[in-house]
């Protein structure tokens, strides 16, 4: 596979924003520069006072762009296009004002989430296709927007991931899904609390910072270098990145995030741009890390007020990237094709090509996805078939502990105060135990039910019944698969 040619420039991209007087943005600098190199629409999301406007204004100044900054919450359409006036031929032309958008090279639509719906619809074509009323904005290159975090829709018991997640902004509404999906980059700005002490001190002591010509030139060079390398990357890694993108987008549906076909196409371009920026600064930059950086900064759900399950997203990224690096003949590709977590774990244990670490990860993942009852049945199956020799100690201990709840003789204690919920559940358990017959299989189930009741006082009749059903279903599944294998 060809490696992109390193550009001749000796100017690295690392620390450019800091040298422009923008401190604490090092982690998102490759993403910001990638947005400049690709010229894809950029949306910044962050709390008030986190330098969203300063960042974009300073970039426009450094690049010497004809710049328009509009407050979308106050914007009237005439402010944007000028005033309509019929000419002598009866055609409609617009009388431009100093604020008109027509000569702009960069447009910043601030407070986009506070914009009136009718105005937001009119801004849609600017963000999406650089047009107003169907007329092309010939000089427009950059489309930037900013907004405060919208109210976050999450599960009732979800806790905010950080203190900033709990901050609400009156009037900041989630963006329409179609509009949010037009932004190539959706970047969360760091809040004051997220900054290092050094960055905080720098912000305090550098209230104003002039853009030196040398720094402006360095920004130009970094953008041009990244733009050239991005095109090479797209050719050199097309197959690998296409597979990664497809797999991670497919996997996103399983974690509650729906990414569109447009997003898949945009993600590929974002990955190439982000890695191009990182590569021009460090030819040894890891492509997988660039994929993660691109993915985590291009999700429209962040603008829609939909909480991103970051842990699950990272797992989806790792799975997709791992498979994308495998050769076509590698048997481990079967693992990626298998959607059932339990079957995938068993397959990983059988494949000699999978490492012990990979097998352990698949087993741990399967245990995490199994419901109560099914989890214990899966653990017991692994013990019965001596299949834990390849898993790491921590996972093996978890398996042994789960299996022991069914193998160890359990004692049922009914000395609970009458009339309580706990007593009602206990009576339900007692009735179920009385229905079991003397057999090895029912003995395992008996131990499981008593263990579930004893170790968790929050168990309900429904949760006990669900665990029993899950156990029975998983045990039956293993029996059927065993009989099928024998018949074959």
Language model regions located:
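Conserved alpha-helical scaffold flanking the Walker A/P-loop in AAA+ ATPase domains
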Residues: 31-35, 85-107
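Walker B catalytic acidic pair
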Residues: 110-112, 122
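Walker A/P-loop
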Residues: 36-75, 85
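Canonical AAA+ ATPase core
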Residues: 114-119, 129-219
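Pre-Walker A (pre-P-loop) alpha-helix and adjacent loop at the N terminus of AAA/AAA+ ATPase modules
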Residues: 4-48
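Basic, amphipathic alpha-helical bundle interface domains used for macromolecular binding and assembly
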Residues: 207-317
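Loop/turn-to-beta-strand initiation segments
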Residues: 40-41, 103-107, 135-144
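Terminal-proximal interaction/regulatory segments of ATP-powered molecular machines
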Residues: 314-488
């Amino acid at each position: 596979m060809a490696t992109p040619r390193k550009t001749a420039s000796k100017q690295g991209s690392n620390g450019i924003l800091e040298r422009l007087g923008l401190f604490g943005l090092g982690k998102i600098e490759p993403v910001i520069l990638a947005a400049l190199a690709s010229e894809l629409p950029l949306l910044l999301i962050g709390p008030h006072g986190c330098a969203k406007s300063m960042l974009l204004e300073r970039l426009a100044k450094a690049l010497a762009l004809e710049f328009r900054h509009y407050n979308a919450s106050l914007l009237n359409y005439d402010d944007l296009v000028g005033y309509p006036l019929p000419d002598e031929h009866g055609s409609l032309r617009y009388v431009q004002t100093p604020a008109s958008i027509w000569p702009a090279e960069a447009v910043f639509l601030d407070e986009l989430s506070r914009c009136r719906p009718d105005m937001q619809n009119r801004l849609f074509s600017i963000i999406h296709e650089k047009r107003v009323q169907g007329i092309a904005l010939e000089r427009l290159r950059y489309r930037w927007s900013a907004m405060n975090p919208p109210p976050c829709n999450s599960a009732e018991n979800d806790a905010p991931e950080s203190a900033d997640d709990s901050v609400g902004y009156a009037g900041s509404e989630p963006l329409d899904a179609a509009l949010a999906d037009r932004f190539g980059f959706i970047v969360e700005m760091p809040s004051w609390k997220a900054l290092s002490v050094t960055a905080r001190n720098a912000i305090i002591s550098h209230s104003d910072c002039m853009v030196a010509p040398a720094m402006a030139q360095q920004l130009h060079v970094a953008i041009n270098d990244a733009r050239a390398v991005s095109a090479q990357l797209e050719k050199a890694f097309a197959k690998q990145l296409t597979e990664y993108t497809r797999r991670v987008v497919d996997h996103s549906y399983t974690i509650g995030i729906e990414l569109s076909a447009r997003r898949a196409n945009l993600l590929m371009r974002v990955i190439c741009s982000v890695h191009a920026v990182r590569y021009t600064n460090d030819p040894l930059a890891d492509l997988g890390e660039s994929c993660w950086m691109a993915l985590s900064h291009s999700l429209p759900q962040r603008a829609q007020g939909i909480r991103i399950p970051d842990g699950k997203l990272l797992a989806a990224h790792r799975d997709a990237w791992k498979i994308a690096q495998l050769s076509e003949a590698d048997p481990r590709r079967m693992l990626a094709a298998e959607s059932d977590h339990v079957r995938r774990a068993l397959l990983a244990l059988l494949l000699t090509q999978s490492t012990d670490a990979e097998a352990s990860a698949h087993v741990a993942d399967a245990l995490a996805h199994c419901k109560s009852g099914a989890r214990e049945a899966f653990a017991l199956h692994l013990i019965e078939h001596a299949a834990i020799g390849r898993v790491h100690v921590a996972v093996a201990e978890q398996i042994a502990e789960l299996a022991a709840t069914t193998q160890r003789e359990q004692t049922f204690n009914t000395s609970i105060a009458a009339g309580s919920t706990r007593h009602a559940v206990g009576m339900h358990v007692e009735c179920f135990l009385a229905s079991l017959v003397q057999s090895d299989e029912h003995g395992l189930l008996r131990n499981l039910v008593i263990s579930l009741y004893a170790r968790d006082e929050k168990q309900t009749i429904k949760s006990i019944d669900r665990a029993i059903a899950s156990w029975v279903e998983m045990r039956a599944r293993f029996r059927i698969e065993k009989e099928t294998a024998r018949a074959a």
